[in-house]
UniProtKB/Swiss-Prot annotation:
Organism expressing this protein natively: Proteus mirabilis (strain HI4320)
Ranges where the record places region Disordered: 41-88
GO molecular function annotation: protein transmembrane transporter activity
Subunit structure, as described in the record: The Tat system comprises two distinct complexes: a TatABC complex, containing multiple copies of TatA, TatB and TatC subunits, and a separate TatA complex, containing only TatA subunits. Substrates initially bind to the TatABC complex, which probably triggers association of the separate TatA complex to form the active translocon.
Classification of source organism: Bacteria, Pseudomonadati, Pseudomonadota, Gammaproteobacteria, Enterobacterales
Record localization: Cell inner membrane
Family: Belongs to the TatA/E family.
Keywords assigned: Cell inner membrane, Cell membrane, Membrane, Protein transport, Translocation, Transmembrane, Transmembrane helix, Transport
Pfam family, one: TatA_B_E
Any GO CC annotation of this UniProt entry: TAT protein transport complex
Function of the molecule: Part of the twin-arginine translocation (Tat) system that transports large folded proteins containing a characteristic twin-arginine motif in their signal peptide across membranes. TatA could form the protein-conducting channel of the Tat system.
Residues spanning the membrane: 1-21
Protein name as annotated: Sec-independent protein translocase protein TatA
Principal location listed in the UniProt entry: membrane
Length: 88
């Protein structure tokens, strides 16, 4: 009841085409598409910069990170060595 029906949208579209012409609408559409494409590219570049900055900040330390399996194996070795020393 309160919304715009399909017939009203078609009438508005016909009036817009008559006022501006198809050529002007075509150039307007291509300009709009180019601006949206440029905006998406700029946003992608911004996200790329953020990820590069995040990678740089996470790799600030001068030491190599150890694998979790390597950590557990070295901890197991140290506990067995301490048990052997206590038993002696």
């Amino acid at each position: 009841m309160g919304g715009i029906s399909i017939w009203q949208l078609l009438i508005i579209a016909v009036i817009v085409v008559l006022l501006f012409g198809t050529n002007k609408l075509r150039t307007l559409g291509s300009d709009l598409g180019a601006s949206v494409k440029g905006f998406k590219k700029a946003m992608g570049d911004e996200n790329q910069k953020e990820t590069n900055n995040a990678e740089k900040t996470t790799n600030d330390a001068d030491f190599d990170t150890k694998n979790l399996a390597q950590k557990t194996s070295t901890e197991e070795k140290s506990t067995t060595e301490s048990k052997n020393k206590e038993q002696v």
